[in-house]
C-alpha cells in the first residue's frame, strides 16, 4: 500500500511542501530532494528579490533603456509571457510588476490613484522589443 510522505521546506518567502505517495521512503526522499533542488534553482534564477538573478538583469534593462540577451530557458518563459499577453488581450502583462512599488497587497488598502497614474506610463509590453534571444527596452 502506498504511503503519503511530506517534505516541508521554504522557498520564495513562503512555506512549501512536497507531498508524494510511495512505498519506498528512500526513493521518495530522492524524488522530493530533486523537486526541492529545482525550486531552489528557479528561485535563484528568477527571484525579484535577488540582485544576482536573471530577472534582476531584465528589470535593470527595462529601467535604463538597454538590451540583454537571454538564455534559452528564459527565452521560452518570455515567449510564453508574450503568448499569454496576446491571448488575454493584454490583461496578462509582465511589465505590471512595477505596481508593487505602491501597492501593498498585504494591507488590503488601495494605493493613492496618483501613485498608480505615475507608474502607468512605464507599464506595457509595447515598451519592450522581444526578438529572441534579445530583449530591449524601448523607453
Question: What is each PLM-predicted segment?
Answer:
Residues 1-139:
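A contiguous, well-ordered beta/alpha segment that forms the leading edge of an enzyme domain
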Amino acid at each position: 500500500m502506498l504511503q503519503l510522505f511530506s517534505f516541508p521546506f521554504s522557498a520564495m518567502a513562503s512555506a512549501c511542501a512536497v507531498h508524494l505517495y510511495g512505498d519506498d521512503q528512500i526513493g521518495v526522499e530522492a524524488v522530493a530532494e530533486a523537486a526541492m533542488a529545482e525550486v531552489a534553482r528557479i528561485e535563484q534564477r528568477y527571484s525579484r528579490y535577488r540582485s544576482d538573478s536573471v530577472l534582476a538583469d531584465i528589470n535593470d534593462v527595462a529601467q535604463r533603456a538597454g538590451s540583454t540577451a537571454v538564455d534559452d530557458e528564459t527565452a521560452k518563459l518570455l515567449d510564453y509571457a508574450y503568448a499569454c499577453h496576446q491571448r488575454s488581450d493584454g490583461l496578462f502583462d509582465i511589465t505590471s510588476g512595477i505596481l508593487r512599488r505602491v501597492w501593498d497587497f498585504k494591507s488590503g488598502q488601495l494605493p493613492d490613484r496618483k501613485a498608480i497614474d505615475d507608474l502607468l506610463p512605464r507599464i506595457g509590453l509595447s515598451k519592450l522589443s522581444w526578438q529572441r534571444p534579445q530583449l530591449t527596452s524601448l523607453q
